[in-house]
A protein has these predicted regions:
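Structural motif corresponding to alpha-helix initiation and N-cap regions
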Residues: 50-53, 81, 122
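Short beta-strand/turn micro-motifs composed of small residues
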Residues: 12, 70, 98
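Glycine-rich, charge-decorated loop segments at or immediately adjacent to ligand/cofactor-binding or catalytic sites
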Residues: 101-117
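Inter-motif core of Ras-like GTPase G domains
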Residues: 64-68
Length: 149
């Protein structure tokens, strides 16, 4: 599987935030999920709007799935909507993350364009990415140990 990693793009506004970093902490925590990140928030932000959009198109084009962060949407809604609309136009599935540490509902624009919404949980996120990017169903089961008295 490491020879064929899932290619993903995580929404950004040319700056990393806590949620952006957290996505990769969750993905790396499993130790068995291999991915290639095509997003480049650390790159120099293009000056004009059309150059920004062209740069985002270039970053999204090679990916198999797009991860949308509501925190980035709050910072730059127009930019995130462009990223989501381009992903849809390019036939890329979208996994939207719930708001981290909050019960606040996702913005309607995100819910309407997302193919799947994932909780902030390593297993849920990885399963959603596998389902959307490669149509792989996981066969994991939860096991609960309990003692009878």
């Amino acid at each position: 599987m490491s020879a064929n990693p899932i290619r993903l793009f995580v929404t950004h506004a040319w700056l990393e935030n806590d949620d952006y970093t957290r996505v990769f902490e969750y993905l790396e925590a499993s130790g068995t999920f291999y991915y290639f990140n095509s997003s480049q928030p650390q790159a120099k932000q293009p000056i004009d709007k059309e150059s920004q959009r062209e740069d985002l198109r270039r970053q999204i084009a090679p990916c198999e799935v797009v991860v949308v962060l509501p925190a980035v949407y709050r910072l730059a809604p127009e930019l995130v909507l462009f990223q989501m609309n381009f992903a849809k136009a390019a036939d890329k599935p979208i996994v939207a993350m719930e708001n981290f540490g909050s019960t606040e509902p996702l913005p309607k624009a995100i819910k309407d364009l997302a193919d799947e919404v994932s909780a902030w949980n390593e297993r849920n996120l990885i399963d959603a990415l596998r389902r959307q990017a490669r149509h792989q169903e996981t066969t994991r089961w939860d096991t609960i140990d309990f003692k009878l008295d």
